[in-house]
């Protein structure tokens, strides 16, 4: 068949524009496309929620791609292996309780699982601010193109209305810190004091699930952002806690959606 370059342009512009407009109102906006939010997005979408992931970078997956120090392998504890099974991620036992998976396969299948379930992904779209209403409750997000943010260009953003936001932005806990910076007297965990603690894998893995909660009205925190927001230790290239945190975030969000 003959190809018309203009039709190609129109197809891309038309279809993406329709999707963007359709997702100006969502049930849950997940900020950051790391493993916790990918897990949360899948389970939310499977439950019928309208969800979108906003990732500033070109690719999703957070720090999982590189495994440990660019060795593309990750470790997962036994209690999280059921989530690997759910996504069809292969793994093998290294020692009792320690399971190893290929980091690249893991990210690919997490992304596939989330999108196949119906989660929409907006990569190269950065979070800039939250929308608030009565009592300063979070009711939406403010977004811009990722390159605009990186280059610090003076371009006004656009807004997305959402019932809930999940901060899965990793060590920086970007959404949490934005609220602390811009809403007077806002209280979010221990942010503004110490932030994330140094490495302690065992404790960090335990606390990341405990720290996954609605940390501010309309905002759930998950993954490494949860540890940062609650002054909990980092854990390195062991990802069971990340996966379980995403699962818990989805359950919490579904419970909250029923209340709204």
UniProtKB/Swiss-Prot annotation:
The keyword Transport does not apply. Transmembrane segments: none annotated. Glycine binds at residue 234. Keywords: Iron, Metal-binding, NAD, Thiamine biosynthesis, Transferase. Its cofactor is Fe(2+). Fe cation binds at residues 156, 171. Its EC number is 2.4.2.59. One of its GO terms (biological process) is thiamine biosynthetic process. It catalyses: hydrogen sulfide + glycine + NAD(+) = ADP-5-ethyl-4-methylthiazole-2-carboxylate + nicotinamide + 3 H2O + H(+). NAD(+) binds at residues 36, 55-56, 63, 154-156, 224. Pfam families: Thi4. It comes from the Archaea. GO terms for molecular function: iron ion binding; pentosyltransferase activity. Pathway: Cofactor biosynthesis; thiamine diphosphate biosynthesis. Disulfide bonds: none annotated. It is an enzyme of class 2 (transferase). Belongs to the THI4 family. Homooctamer; tetramer of dimers. Involved in the biosynthesis of the thiazole moiety of thiamine. Catalyzes the conversion of NAD and glycine to adenosine diphosphate 5-(2-hydroxyethyl)-4-methylthiazole-2-carboxylate (ADT), an adenylated thiazole intermediate, using free sulfide as a source of sulfur. This is Thiamine thiazole synthase.
């Amino acid at each position: 068949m003959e190809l018309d370059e203009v039709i190609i342009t129109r197809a891309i512009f038309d279809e993406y524009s329709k999707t963007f407009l359709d997702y100006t109102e969502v049930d849950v906006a997940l900020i950051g496309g790391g493993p916790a939010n990918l897990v949360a997005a899948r389970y939310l979408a499977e439950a019928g929620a309208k969800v979108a992931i906003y990732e500033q970078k070109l690719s999703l997956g957070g720090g999982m791609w590189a495994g440990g120090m660019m060795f593309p392998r990750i470790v997962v504890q036994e209690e999280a292996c059921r989530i690997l099974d759910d996504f069809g991620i292969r793994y093998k036992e290294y020692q009792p309780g320690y399971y190893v998976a290929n980091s690249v396969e893991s990210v690919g299948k997490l992304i596939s699982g989330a999108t196949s379930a119906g989660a929409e992904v907006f990569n190269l779209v950065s979070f800039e601010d939250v929308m608030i209403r009565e009592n300063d409750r979070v009711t939406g997000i403010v977004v811009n193109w990722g390159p605009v943010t990186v280059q610090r260009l003076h371009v006004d953003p656009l807004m997305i209305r959402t019932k809930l936001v999940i901060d899965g932005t990793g060590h920086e806990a970007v959404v949490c810190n934005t609220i602390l910076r811009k809403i007077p007297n806002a209280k979010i965990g221990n942010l503004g004091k110490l932030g994330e603690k140094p490495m302690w894998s065992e404790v960090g893995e335990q606390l990341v699930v405990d720290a996954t909660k609605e940390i501010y009205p309309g905002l759930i925190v998950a993954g490494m952002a949860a540890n940062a927001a609650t002054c909990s230790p980092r854990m390195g290239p062991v990802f069971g806690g990340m996966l379980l945190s995403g699962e818990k975030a989805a359950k919490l969000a579904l419970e909250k959606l029923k209340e709204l």
